[in-house]
Structure formats: structure tokens, C-alpha cells
Amino acid sequence: MQHLNELIEKAKLAIESIQDRSLTALDEIRVEYFGKKGHFTQLMQELRNVSAEERPAMGAKINEAKQAALEFLNAKKTEWEQAELNAKLEKERVDVSLPGRKVETGGLHPVTMTINRVTKFFSELGFSVENGPEIESDYYNFDALNIPKHHPARADHDTFWFNPELLLRTQTSGVQIRTMEKMQPPIRIMAPGRVYRNDYDQTHTPMFHQIELLYVDKKANFTELKGLLHDFLRAFFEEDLQVRFRPSYFPFTEPSAEVDVMGKNGKWLEVLGCGMVHPNVLRNVGIDPNEYSGFAVGMGVERLTMLRYNVTDLRSFFENDLRFLKQFK
């Protein structure tokens, strides 16, 4: 029994002598005394040399001594772990009285803001949004829109072609054709989306956004078109603008016009194109042009955004410069 007490004291002394409360050193002592080859384990193995009558009592004493030493070790381990945690927390302590970090909120891209502004205006007038594929067929992008085979828009330097029949759409007009094929008049839709043209400079990018309008009914006329666009432009720019319609040419409308607004510098600025849907386009989708008429409008979203916010370089919208984008929050 005296030998067991000495072993307990020896274990306690070894634990107390550990420098800097090292948990690694403490674990080494655990292995030395309680491991497979530890002191207490060896004592248990020596019981085989003790007589059967003395073995139970001797085994109980060894277990009691082992438990006392182990409890001392575990108590130290818990104490040191808590001290280590407290030191770590103290080191990482947060001063809750300090002002918090400013969290910046995101905002809509100016192009998205314009799309939302335009679609909101026309949706309140009964126009619904229709979408179509960006990889379009030659038929829907050109043929059905009365664009002749020799038209320059079909050339490789203006259009991104995949093969002789498939291309990246140059306009969202294909959505108008697809809608007229599946719907009967009256039709009142808008088609926002990305379009692609092989051009890149201060006022052109290879990809840009367009919104087209289509209205088909028995009484659609140019006077109604003019009134609609007057109201839209004044609402969009929030000014009582001067608006003028200039005769123009588009293969898919007849008559056709380009629409200008008077800028602050006293000069006319082109904002969109429009016209009455060409009878051939109506025939291509099975609508009788003798019974129905319609008008169409096409506007470049980036163009409208540049004019509304006085942006001079179209490419700024696609450079993701936060210094530029923050101005539109």
C-alpha cells in the first residue's frame, strides 16, 4: 500500500512540475502512468503473481490508487484547458463599444433600372412581356420580317453567324413573329432582351439590350402610335420634352419613323425607331392586313440610359466599375 501511495505522489509531483501548463506534457504523463505500458498497468499485470486469495483485495487497492491519480490528472487538464480558453478569449476580445463596420448595400444596374422603368410604363397600358431565344434562325430574324436577302444587316461584318441558318439575334423582333404565330389579335406585347451586332466603339457594343413593342388590332394607326410615344418619352425623362418624328425606312414597317427629343444643348437626339407593321410581315404570320393593322417600336436600352443619366461612353455599362455604378443608387 505504501508503494501505491508513493506512486500517486510521484504522479502528482510530475504533473505539478509541468512548465507553462502544457497540455502536451500532461498527455505524456497520462501515457507514462495510465497507458498500455504505464506504471499502473504494469501493477495490474503483476497480479498474476499474487495468490488467488490476495488478488481481489490487491486489485481493488491498485484500482483505487489509479483512480485517485487519474482524477487529479483530469482535474488539472480541465483547469488548464479552461485557462487556455480564457486567455484566447481575452486576446480576441471584441470591444462592443466600437462603431460597427459600414455594410454597403447593392443596387440595380442602370440598364436594369431602365428596363424596369420602360416595362412598368407599358405594362400599365396593357402590354405584356414576351421572351424568345437569343440564338435565332435566319427566318425569324430576317425573312419573316421582310428583310431581303441582299440587306447589309445579313453581312458577316454586322451579324454573328453560327452557320447559314443560325445566328445571334440582331434584334428582338423575332419575338414579335413568334407571338403573332401563336396568338390572335388584338396583340399588345413588349419584348425586352439582349441582342448582338458585330460593332464596338464609344456608342456601340457587341451585345446590348433592346425593347420592342408590338400592337396589332383592327384600328391601330399612326396617330395612336405618336400619342403613345409622346406620353412614354415625357414620362421616362420626366420632362415636357419636344418630340419629333422623322420619316425613315425599316423593311418591317411602312410608314417608318425615327423619333428624336430636344436635348438640353438645343440639339435633336435620336431615341428610338417605329412604324406601322408592314403588310408582308402580317401575311407571313397568317394575319390579314386588310382586316388588321399594327405598329411596332424598337428602342435601345443603353441609348435611353445614356440620355437619361448623361453618360457619354456606352462601354461604361459593361466595365463593372463600382465608382461608376454607385452613382445610380
From Swiss-Prot:
The enzyme's E.C. designation: 6.1.1.20
UniProt GO molecular function: ATP binding; magnesium ion binding; phenylalanine-tRNA ligase activity; tRNA binding
Cofactor: Mg(2+)
ATP-binding recorded as keyword: yes
Residue sites binding Mg(2+) per the record: 254
Domain of life from the UniProt record: Bacteria
Subcellular location: Cytoplasm
Main location: cytoplasm
One Pfam short name: tRNA-synt_2d
Oligomer and partners: Tetramer of two alpha and two beta subunits.
Family: Belongs to the class-II aminoacyl-tRNA synthetase family. Phe-tRNA synthetase alpha subunit type 1 subfamily.
Protein name as it appears in the record: Phenylalanine--tRNA ligase alpha subunit
Organism: Haemophilus influenzae (strain PittEE)
Lineage of the species this protein comes from: Bacteria, Pseudomonadati, Pseudomonadota, Gammaproteobacteria, Pasteurellales
